[in-house]
Amino acid sequence: MLLNTPAQLSLPLYLPDDETFASFYPGENPSLLAAIQSAVHQPHGSYIYFWSREGGGRSHLLHAACAELSQQGEAVGYVPLDKRAYFIPEVLEGMEQLALVCIDNIECIAGDEQWEMAMFNLYNRIVETGRTRLLITGDRPPRQLNLGLPDLASRLDWGQIYKLQPLSDDEKLQALQLRAKLRGFELPEDVGRFLLKRLDREMRTLFMTLDQLDRASITAQRKLTIPFVKEILSL
């Protein structure tokens, strides 16, 4: 769990420094991106739920929202429920005091009575206060989460619901090139297409590989070419 909170709730917030709104390539998701940015900049509470298959950019958008408000000195919280084994449901208590609460991978608590009730209670407290922005992600629409608590499924279905559309191969190439540009180097189109052809096309894998190639090119003082990529990745 990652928090940047008032003193009484103080825990450090660690966010990937490269997962911001500026580095997010929206593809066919400009409406979702605009909705999240609007929610972040509004002074009152709001709720957005968006879903996609794993690796579709869900966490990136939550990290970006946290970073945006955290940089403004606001109190924010990010809870990755796929890692809930490392904390307990009581961590959600008091989060209605924060400016932004991001709940990632809510599908992971399906069937867990304690976590479902804790999430249900947090949702209700946030609605009552009317101040907190709430962003929740899942791997499917709220009504298909197989939650054991029907009232929680109903609450999750009340807000703005979006499907995070996957990127096409051309859009993945542009996302990689944007990532490279923000890191200060160029990814030639032929190299990008080679990576898409030879590697797992899941974006997290592609970004990790791009970072690896960036470090290797700096060390070797060479530009990214297909022969160099083959050498570094043993392809």
From Swiss-Prot:
SUPFAM superfamilies, sorted: P-loop containing nucleoside triphosphate hydrolases
Q: Enumerate the Gene Ontology biological process terms.
A: DNA replication initiation; negative regulation of DNA-templated DNA replication initiation
Q: Which UniProt keywords apply?
A: DNA replication, DNA replication inhibitor
Q: Which domain of life is it from?
A: Bacteria
Biological role stated in the UniProt entry: Mediates the interaction of DNA replication initiator protein DnaA with DNA polymerase subunit beta sliding clamp (dnaN). Stimulates hydrolysis of ATP-DnaA to ADP-DnaA, rendering DnaA inactive for reinitiation, a process called regulatory inhibition of DnaA or RIDA.
Q: How does it assemble?
A: The active form seems to be an ADP-bound monomer. Forms the RIDA complex (regulatory inactivation of DnaA) of ATP-DnaA, ADP-Hda and the DNA-loaded beta sliding clamp (dnaN).
> What family does the Swiss-Prot or TrEMBL record give for this protein?
Belongs to the DnaA family. HdA subfamily.
Q: Under which name does UniProt file this protein?
A: DnaA regulatory inactivator Hda
Tell me the organism. Yersinia pestis (strain Pestoides F)
The taxonomic lineage of its organism, from the top, reads: Bacteria, Pseudomonadati, Pseudomonadota, Gammaproteobacteria, Enterobacterales
